[in-house]
Amino acid sequence: MHLYGDCAAERKQEKNNNMAKKKIYENYIGYTILKPIVDWNLKHSYRKVEVRGKENIPTDGAVIIAPNHCNTLMDALVILRAFDSPTVFGARADIFNNKFIGKIMTFLRILPMVRQRDGLRNVLKNNETQEIIVETLENRVRFCMFPEGRHRPAHSLQSLGKGTFRAALAANAKFGDRFPVYIVPTGLEYGDYFRYRSTSLVTFGKPINVTGFVKGQDVDNEVKLIEPLRKELAARMSELFTYLKDGEQLHDKWALTKILATHQGVRYGDFGTSLHEGMLANREIAARIEKACEEKPEEMSELLEKVEKFEKKRRKEKISIYSFRKKNNVLNIAGESLAALIGLPYWIFSAIVSAPMWLTYNLLRSKTRDRAFHNTVGFGVKLALGIILFLIYTILAFCLLPWPFALAVSLLTIPSYSMFFDYNEGMRRFISDIRLMGEKGLRKSYKEIVKTFNKEF
């Protein structure tokens, strides 16, 4: 009797879960309240955020957003912020193994996506998930899937899985006669994958009309339909961020891209600059590098070896690549010193009031094996503690200080966490500028790499 009761309870729980999942696309008050808070914290997790190409997103059908996956949970969050209306996401199923986290993920409109490596028995669960995806799309709610399946902090693309295309074809089979199904290629570009308070650029490309594509084919075989769709999506995605071909020298090619970009004075994320224009400039440089690798592979291999040695030396000496684009003379150093002194009082204030956050961030970061999660940790800490600390400091300030001073303290606490990181980054680059002044050999290597590439390629 007890066993029967347990089974009945499990079936009831499973039924309730299925009902909840099937309504994952519907509006509910908790999500409506939380989304603006998440969006605000996401915006202030970066120095600069840009969204381009929203005019490319169709309004006459079902839409699947398909971005590259390079920065863990932050990839989903920057997509989420790009829209006012809800977006449902797919994520690795193993994240849902923890029941508490699974409930949070479901609350955030995230579905478990099982991969082949998870075993055949688990893969079969994707049939249920796919039904929910199709229902979501049928109700004209966007669904975001990362075709690569797993994240990798690199300016390239991994092989695209079949999940995105199977979902699109299943949706088209169910309601494609009523309205079309689209896959929108999307490019995500970050100023830095690992440093909190970098930059974020989202670019939506021209959509792939899956319904129109299927109508133009003479085959019903899913495999034969998926392969050309996969090639087309990969080609369009690679046009929306600084793309380099995958391979052993990928990181050296990216390092060379940054070297040439700093030499050309490409301003990426600086005040008054456009992230999109900076990305386009980087793409042109990357295209030149790929062309050189194809036309003169041996010469480029030698140059990339020099780049690798340069990078090892630069990182060992803790010198930022951005220090090379400036004339680090005494006058500039004096100006930077003055700016550091002016900002010091507020940095001290920020360091004190945001200490619970940045200490927690440093602790969690030290225990996070995958560096790609560092930005996610920084965001999570701000989201979890930011409002609580603001309320505590505001109450204390108005209890202990005259209201004008209390109001000032309250307002100054809002950007303190961001200011703390921005000042630290400024100081890191300032110290880097000073160090570079004493590194004649490194400056010489930098100039030789630039000269060699521009002369021979």
Predicted regions and their residues:
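Long, positively charged, glycine-interspersed low-complexity recognition regions
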Residues: 343, 347-455
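Membrane-anchoring hydrophobic helices of lipid-metabolizing enzymes
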Residues: 19-66, 72-78, 83, 107-109, ...
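Membrane helical hairpin/interfacial module
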Residues: 91-102, 108
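Non-catalytic C-terminal accessory region of glycerolipid acyltransferases
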Residues: 20-21, 29, 117-322, 326, ...
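Basic/hydrophobic alpha-helical interface regions
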Residues: 47, 81-87, 130, 159
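Cationic, low-complexity basic patches in intrinsically disordered or flexible, solvent-exposed regions
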Residues: 11-13
